[in-house]
From Swiss-Prot:
Annotated segments matching region Alpha N-terminal domain (alpha-NTD): 1-231
Catalytic activities: RNA(n) + a ribonucleoside 5'-triphosphate = RNA(n+1) + diphosphate
A Pfam family recorded for this sequence: RNA_pol_A_bac
Family from the record: Belongs to the RNA polymerase alpha chain family.
GO biological process: DNA-templated transcription
TM regions (residue ranges): none
SUPFAM superfamilies hit by this protein: C-terminal domain of RNA polymerase alpha subunit, Insert subdomain of RNA polymerase alpha subunit, RBP11-like subunits of RNA polymerase
Gene3D superfamilies per record: 5' to 3' exonuclease, C-terminal subdomain (1.10.150.20), DNA-directed RNA polymerase, insert domain (2.170.120.12), RNA polymerase, RBP11-like subunit (3.30.1360.10)
The name this protein goes by in its record: DNA-directed RNA polymerase subunit alpha
Amino acid sequence: MQTALLKPKIIAVEPLGDHHAKVVMEPFERGYGHTLGNALRRVLLSSMVGYAPTEVTIAGVVHEYSTIDGVQEDVVNLLLNLKGVVFKLHNRDEVTVSLRKEGEGVVTAADIELPHDVEIINPGHVIASLSAGGKLDMQIKVEQGRGYVPGNVRKFGDESSKVIGRIVLDASFAPVRRVSYAVESARVEQRTDLDKLVMNIETNGVISPEEAIRQSARILVDQLSVFAALEGTESAAEAAAARAPQIDPILLRPVDDLELTVRSANCLKAENIYYIGDLIQRTENELLKTPNLGRKSLNEIKEVLASRGLTLGMKLENWPPAGLEK
């Protein structure tokens, strides 16, 4: 009897327009089309990385309910138009860009001054219309993120740093605009009870529909991998011990193993420095404050440590380890 689950062998991508495609996957076992289609759809809409304007400062504007002389749109509509600009950042998480224009005419996304590693997908997008004598001067902060983040959630954590006139925007980072899926019948040899998953995906151009599917699948695999590795419930202490960095065995050895002079060794023990791990965490200034330990003894300690690849002033996590005797 056949017990192995079928995996899709046919994956077809049919372009339907700019940044719009239909992705077909088959065959799936019965019921898997809806199971995977719904999971992929939710991840595509909520968890993909994108970019959005998050803060704006406009010259002469104190709050979003203002108007600007010579600009046909009020500030609320101007900000709504600005949210429609699709940014793409390369090798950075945030950037502040400028928009300066004056004189009669239409202001588009192409008028935004960009550094070399920032791209605008829709440069023809209209932001505002200026009349004769109109002037628009804006600073726009663009950030990387996931999903939708309301402005009141990400408002200034430190109110003292708030700049008068800085407007915080609701940010829609999601690069996937629309996703729908359908499950149709598929057939393999004599089996006719299989599923075909058809996904219709439209993005804003920051990512292609095919790449969006790949990334969403990776996210699901990553989230579910913890269940595949599940071997039972471990105690909190065991979990913490497993996460703790391993300590170099040389640090657990007593300072006597350094074969220091009697004077230096006695000075260290008087300061409760029993192990090499205790010693390397002390600084030169701290050791020089030790009674009867002078510059000569300090140099001796430094030379002995250097011969073992160690120095003073090192930082150790989880020191001392549990069970270390003093």
